[in-house]
């Protein structure tokens, strides 16, 4: 590590490895699900010698989503040239409030989702290196933080192949990933009931990020196909957790 003013720089070792193979993903999906379970299991209960003032993850996500959706409301329109309508943005705003409340109430009511988990924060194929069907390296750990593990698992189930392919995982591929994860780090009944809400939250986090890049960062050509594909598949993608 090297510090310069208020900036801290980290030099990471180069790791040889292969990218995610979208043509034959089954074994890599299985390996990735198992590795995420191992990561959560190994870091469960970890106590850092430094205690940053972390806000609850759901609080950060709620603020992030409300800010993005408010920005989007000012630029989206109802013509076919826009990927989403103002009405859809309004519906998502209402859904954010309901989803966050559901997560918070379940945590308070059940007391079975300890914050002793440490999550990766952006566990996707783009942040993994493979050696055939094995995981060679997990990258970009700068997003790691204490939080309920469902935030990691839900985001991975929805956005694991993002950037490498325009379309999300199928429900069958999600099942492969989840089964492999639970073979190492099983979910509790409380967590199973909350998984659908976390899938929806994950979808909203990703789709609003892409829409933000689409409208405000000059990335329409890049993000447009992703947005269209995920909107077409939204029911299958976020409905998986309830099956």
Segments from the language model and where they lie:
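Active-site activation/catalytic loop segments of kinase-like enzymes and analogous catalytic loops
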Residues: 150-185, 201-218
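Conserved structural core of kinase catalytic domains
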Residues: 1-29
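All-alpha amphipathic helical-bundle segments outside canonical DNA-binding/catalytic cores
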Residues: 187-199
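ATP/Mg2+ or Mg2+-diphosphate-binding catalytic cores
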Residues: 71, 76-78, 206-243
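Mechanochemical coupling/switch segment within NTP-driven translocation systems
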Residues: 86-106
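A cross-family kinase active-site recognition segment
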Residues: 22-91, 116, 228
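Active-site acidic catalytic loop and adjacent metal/ATP-binding pocket
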Residues: 101-151
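Short small-residue beta-strand/loop micro-motif enriched in glycine and branched aliphatics
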Residues: 18-22, 137-138, 163
């Amino acid at each position: 590590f090297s510090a310069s003013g208020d900036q801290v720089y980290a030099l990471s070792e180069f790791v040889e490895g292969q990218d995610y193979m979208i043509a034959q993903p089954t074994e890599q999906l299985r390996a990735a699900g198992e590795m995420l379970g191992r990561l959560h299991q190994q870091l469960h209960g970890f106590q850092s010698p430094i205690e940053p003032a972390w806000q609850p993850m759901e609080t950060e996500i709620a603020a992030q989503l409300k800010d993005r959706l408010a920005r989007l409301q000012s630029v989206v329109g109802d013509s076919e040239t826009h990927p989403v309508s103002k009405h859809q943005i309004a519906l998502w705003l209402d859904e954010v409030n309901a989803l966050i409340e559901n997560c918070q109430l379940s945590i308070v009511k059940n007391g079975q989702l300890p914050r002793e988990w440490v999550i990766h924060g952006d566990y996707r194929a783009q942040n993994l290196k493979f050696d055939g069907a094995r995981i060679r390296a997990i990258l970009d750990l700068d997003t790691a933080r204490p939080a309920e593990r469902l935030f990691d698992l839900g985001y991975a189930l929805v956005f694991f192949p993002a950037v490498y392919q325009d379309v999300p995982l199928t429900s069958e591929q999600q099942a492969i990933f989840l089964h492999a994860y639970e073979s190492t780090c099983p979910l509790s009944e409380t967590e199973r009931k909350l998984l659908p809400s976390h899938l929806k939250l994950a979808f909203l986090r990703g789709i609003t990020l892409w829409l933000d890049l689409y409208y405000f960062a000059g990335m329409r050509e890049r993000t447009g196909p992703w947005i269209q594909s995920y909107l077409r598949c939204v029911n299958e993608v976020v409905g998986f957790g309830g099956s």
